[in-house]
Structures are given as structure tokens and as C-alpha cells.
Amino acid sequence: MAREPRQNELTDEQIAAENAFLEGVPRLNLGAFLMPGIWGPAHGLWICILFYPLWLFADNTFYAAFSERSLLAVVLAAIVCVMLLVVHVVFGILSQPFAWHRADGLGVDKQTYLKREKIWAVAMALVSLTFVVVATYYNLVIRPGVGA
């Protein structure tokens, strides 16, 4: 006996239609995973600008762990690092269907969407690498002398 779905539950047909729609689209969007603060607004997800203060908080905890070397600072930095990684992975997974639905709604075919997302993945890899290099240089070379 099949039970009736509740008002806010998806039906089996809706789930099957969504799975068919997402067929051939990777589960993880690498561009969204690597740089959600840039990728998100470019794909209509403006809430992603909240990643910037999150990254600044993470940068400060990492710098505190490096400069203070106390157990608390190191543990806090490790926790922040793991949580930030989890948030990025979850966003990379959840953003893919939203982005593909948006692109489809704008009339973009699947092959064009996938091609564009590959370009985004490469571009965001370069941008994220640049961010890490610049932040590391700042924290190791510039920041220690700022308050001296």
C-alpha cells in the first residue's frame, strides 16, 4: 500500500523527473566548491557574498594558530578549517542543481552549460590559488610588521 505524500514532500514522479534532468551533470560543481564568493553571484546566488567574512574569520584563526601556537588557537584553526571545507563541499553539491535549472530557464542547453562550468572550474582554481598565495604572503611578510 503506497502512502500519500505530505504537502511539502516530493512525489516519486517529481524525484524521477529531477534525476532525469540532472543526468550527465556532475554531482559536485568545482567552480562553486573552489570560489563560492565569486561563482555564486555570477550564477544568481547573491547570498554567497557571505563567504567573504567567513574567509576572513578563517584567515584570522589560521594566522592566530601560526603566530600564537597555543593549543586553543591551533584547535580552533583546525575546527574552522574542517568546517570551512564541509561548507564548501556542501555548497558545491547543492549549487549544481540550482545553477543547471537557472541555465536551463535561460535557454542554455546541457552541453553548453557543462562547457561553461568547465571554464568556471579552471578559472576558479586559478583564482583560489591566487587568493591562497596572496593571503600567505600577506600573513608571513606584511602582517607581522604592521603593528611593530
Ranges and model annotations:
Residues 13-51:
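Membrane interfacial helix-start motif at the N-side
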Residues 2-22, 56-148:
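Transmembrane helix recognition focused on a "late"/terminal membrane span
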